[in-house]
Each structure stands twice: as structure tokens, then as C-alpha cells.
Amino acid sequence: MFYNYKHFFSIVLQDVVSADYKFVCIDIGAYGKQSDSGIFGFSKLSEQLERGALKAKCEKVLPDSDISVPYVLVGDGGYPLKPYLMRPYPLRNLTQEQETFNKRLSHARQVVECAFGIISNKWRILMKAIEVTPERAGNIVKYICLLHNIILDKEGMSEINGNSTESGNCHNRFVWGANTSSTRATDVREKFKAYFANNP
């Protein structure tokens, strides 16, 4: 059940990463063959967001505008569009504004990739097979995410990047199932699109 499409056994780490590269929510232990959107759809985080338990309905006015939007998570095209979860527009027949939105969303998603690169380069155990039970492997990954956050709190980004030549230039980046989406989710994405188009 942990056998993935790359033909090896794995568990999945699905996370929420803040703009300062910290892991603020992690879900570990899903089967390696499951899709990201499927894992997210059955996660406790998704359940809480659907209920509004994590203040997903709080709104903020975007800088230098009168556009008010809720706080959102950023996902790739495999995730569903939700009022609290932005995904790119499908890649066919995009307007210039939609292309701009997709580029800005992709740029925001790079923070997650950077955080993964940082922990993989600092804790090399993540770059190879961990020969323990899936439960213990999940605990190892949890502790690594926790240690990563502690180091960021105590030493800052320079300590993280100082020991990692492959993590890329993380300082210049920022964050942040069925693909049917609600009218509210589409409205939120349209607001971000309009804002990005007018604030390059």
C-alpha cells in the first residue's frame, strides 16, 4: 500500500509552509500511491478548513488596493479550487491576466519547494531509503520538521542556508480530487487575478 508510481515504498509528507519557510501544519503517513489532492481531501486540515475552524474566513485588504480577500493556501493544479485554497488556471487559452496569476501563484509555491530542499539538504537521511517501520519513518520526518522550525527561530535563515549549497536562493522567494470549485472560490481567485494584473 505504500508502493508508489516510481516503484518504491514511500509515505507522503503533505504540509503547509509559511512565508518564512516554517512548517506550520504537516500530515505524514499517507500511502505513497495516493494523489496529493486525495490525501488533502481526507486530511484533518481539509476537514478543519471546510468547517471554518482555522479562521479561513478572515479577510484582509491587499496592499495599495481596496480588494479584500481571505487568507489562502497555495496549491498546484492537482488540488481543488476552494475559497481557502488557490490553484492555477488550466493551461488552455489563458488570458494575459490569467497567465500573470499563474506565474505569481507558481512563484508563491516555490517557498514550499525551497523548504523541502532545505530539510533534504540539511538532513540527508531524507535523500535515501529510511529502513524503519512506516510509523517510525513518519516520526523521524515530524522531528526533522520540528528541528527545522526551531533552527529558524533561534538562528534564522542564514544558518539554514549556510549549510545547504543546493537549497537555492530562498531569500528572494515568498509564500505561500475533483477540480470542481464553488462560486466563492472562483470569486476569490478572480480578485487575486485582478490585483496581480494591476500590481505587477
Task: Show where each model-derived region lies.
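Short, polybasic Lys/Arg-rich linear motifs in disordered N-terminal/cytosolic regions
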Residues: 1-200
